[in-house]
Amino acid sequence: MGPTPVVTTHKSAPRHPRMFAGVAGRAARALTTAASALALCVGALVVAPAPAHADDTITTQDYFSYYKLDQARAKGYTGKGVTIAMIDGPVDTSAPELAGANITDKSRCTVNSDNKSKTHGTAIASLLVSKNYGFLPDATLYSYQTTFEGQAPSEDCNPDIGTRLDGLASSINFAINDGAQIISISIAAGQIDAKFEAPLNAALSRAINQGIIVVTGMGNTSTDNDGGSYASRNGTVGVSAINLDGSFASDYSSYGDSVTTAAFGGPIKVRDYDTGQISDTSGTSIATPIVAASLALARQKWPDATSNQLLQLLIHTGSNSQQAWNNRTGYGAVNPGALINTDPSQYPDENPVSQKADDAYPTAEMVRDYGDGRADAPLGTFDDTYVYRGTDDIYIHAEFLTQTPHLGTSPAYHRK
């Protein structure tokens, strides 16, 4: 059985088994990359290319009926008035699936992309805002391109200040500056200990403080606590993948302590720019924007709810009985119908993913210091709203900050 119909609050989604893994029914493509490189969460695994040409149009997807999106559209839930961001590969806005979609490339520098990353980025954008089968045909989508493994960043992506304009941390900040309410990230880092990536910790601290929802995939390595997944970070909604029958996608989806929810991971049809065909692909890259889009539908329905209440709504309407958590699907698969039909004002204004684990980053202290203006001033370089309020006078004339520092004015100094 699928998720709840949009016309009712009854939860009919099945519970999910405790085992899940990989990509598209065959060997998953690992997300291991070079230390500073990014990878595609979906693993770009192509399954059984369909005998079609790239100039054919994809008109529907299996998830459209599974999530009862026809009912959502009939009731006017189309993402109208919501701004969502994706950090990914480039989007081919000339693709017929994206005709009429409201998409703007907000990248701050030139990214040298390839067909693989264009296939991925265009697929994610189509899932979000395609007029044919997107969750949010009337939403505003901002795209931010990043440089993937094997690609050389352009010179204009490397400013003198040292933080790349096509990096994840800067892209999160740009998305928030531009007014995005929800950010979907279907990429992964290299298999490294990234706890001390200060710019990323600062960007997520900002998102937590300003109520911006960040959704990211668990990865496609069929492993526990995939080291390449950004879902291990505090402040992120970690998404694993399920199949259409509700079972955990154990042949590819990663899992672990940081999973929050799950969604259909494929296969979906994609426009493959390498082969010139329409192909099928699966991965947590697909599940991630489904969760982000579902939250966007909830944002449209409940404009007065805080982002924390929407996150509480997500975990309280998951498919697991009595909101029980497990390390496969978190609190259970996302249920867009229940998100639309359940009033989030009944839930506390508390972020349920801000502190996933005691040893996860950014720490509660980092989040608090950023909100208090005590984070080192360079960490606010791409934050148009950041005011340094600490006591280090070397930042009094910091030209890299948009806002003038106000030394010694942090509320932390007056807090008992």
Residue ranges and their predicted role:
Residues 113-122, 221, 279-291:
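Gly/Ser-rich catalytic serine loop of serine hydrolases
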Residues 73-84, 89-104, 112-161, 233-234, ...:
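Subtilisin-like serine protease catalytic core
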